[in-house]
Amino acid sequence: MSAPVIEAKDLTKRYGTASAVDGINFNVAAGEIFGLLGPNGAGKTTTILMLLGLSDITSGEARVFGHDPMREPLAVKRLAGYLPDTVGFYDNMSATDNLHYTARLMGIAKRIRKDRIASALARVGLADVAENKVGTFSRGMRQRLGLAEIIMKDARIAILDEPTNGLDPQASIELLELIRSLKAHGVSIVLSSHLLDRVQSVCDRVALFNAGRIVLMGTVGELGRHVLGGGYAVEVEAESSDGLVMRLSALSGVRSVETPEPGRFRMTCDRDLRAEAAAAVVAAGGRLKQLTLDQPSLEMIYTRYFQTAQQEEARHAA
């Protein structure tokens, strides 16, 4: 198993007696999209700034590809691309000129600069407006330009702070698709957001923050089972022959099978059994029309977690 690309061990940031980040621990694997999620003021941005060497660490440690961001900030900067909440481009310069300027600062060789910039702008869908001034860009276009800068840099990890903040739903969907494409090109990604449900589809794992601490961490499915209980819900729609309910019920890991209406079957399972359910439909002589896996929402998980925590506190106080 390869070493994690990011490690945080008992990472803490204090301002006087107040803890902005309070002893958090997490790893990010190579090729993973890892979400730092939670409400504003929970410690997500402070965590990002410590990972990048842009804020002092009070105690604990962080490593980015084995480098200490406090002692080796330039090594981290060479490997990591950063998209802050507010992207700082020059409004009176074109997208191309902005990237040429940052490419020079990064030390990218002149002979490859032009091709890298053109390729990066094409990948984020800005080729047609490459010569337009950035002052005419929408927030979504500015975010795309920020991703283009990360692509141009050939970063091995992208750290994105609230990338969908202020975007309409369609612009958010398009930006998240671009983030997925970074992963497809071998880039590891850390992103923060307070918009839990908007980004849950893109994250492999998430850490849910509250008051500077990580209160939950894992895949959405793992968190759902831990907090909400129950298992996976697999929905099957099929033109079936007799005996399909029996075949589905007999699958290992199936807890129950319901038929809310003819041709629809809802399975509660211990794990994702979509492949096995599809095979059962075929074996029963049926025709599979649709197969879906229902995932709990992060908003639901987060809300339930704190409802339960508050109830526990009330019981102990009574």
Model-derived regions, located:
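ABC-family P-loop ATPase nucleotide-binding domain
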Residues: 1-12, 308-318
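ABC transporter nucleotide-binding domains
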Residues: 3-8, 13-211, 215-216
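Short loop or secondary-structure boundary microenvironments that flank
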Residues: 66, 73, 238, 271, ...
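A generic structural signal for secondary-structure junctions
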Residues: 81, 98, 107, 146, ...
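ABC transporter nucleotide-binding domain
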Residues: 176-268
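C-terminal coupling/interaction segments
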Residues: 269-318
